[in-house]
């Protein structure tokens, strides 16, 4: 019924509760959350990385100037279509400020973790 979801290892698509999608460098990160079972504190989730597809687009035909852009992986679009069917997701306008703040907080955590990792590596060199 959901061939693209099963192709990435999701065996029980009917247990999917929601999903999130974000872009990180040259990848799209899909996180799928499953319904929480009785007695569990946290819902189970799985994360997938999809490399963005690179494409050269003609910017100026006179100078034959090209610009490289990235776009969402075609397989990922099929997976999202199936997830939308399952979650009956309503495509509503997301508060842009809330999204930017969320992305900023995530970036802060990633950078903080990376700084700690680099500092630990420096300590090993002393």
Swiss-Prot record:
Family membership: Belongs to the UPF0325 family.
Top-level taxon: Bacteria
Any Pfam family: DUF3461
Protein name: UPF0325 protein PBPRA2971
Organism encoding this protein: Photobacterium profundum (strain SS9)
NCBIfam families associated with the record: PRK13677.1
HAMAP family xrefs: UPF0325 (MF_01519)
């Amino acid at each position: 019924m959901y061939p693209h979801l099963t192709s990435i290892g999701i065996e029980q698509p009917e247990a999917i509760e929601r999903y999130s999608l974000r872009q990180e460098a040259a990848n799209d990160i899909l996180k799928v959350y499953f319904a929480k079972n009785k007695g569990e504190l946290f819902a189970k989730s799985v994360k997938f990385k999809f490399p963005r597809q690179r494409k050269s687009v003609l910017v100026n035909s006179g100078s034959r100037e090209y610009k490289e852009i990235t776009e969402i992986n075609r397989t990922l679009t099929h997976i999202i279509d199936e997830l939308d069917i399952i979650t009956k997701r309503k495509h509503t306008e997301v508060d842009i400020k809330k999204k930017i703040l969320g992305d900023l907080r995530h970036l802060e955590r990633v950078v903080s973790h990376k700084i700690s990792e680099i500092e630990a590596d420096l300590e090993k060199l002393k």
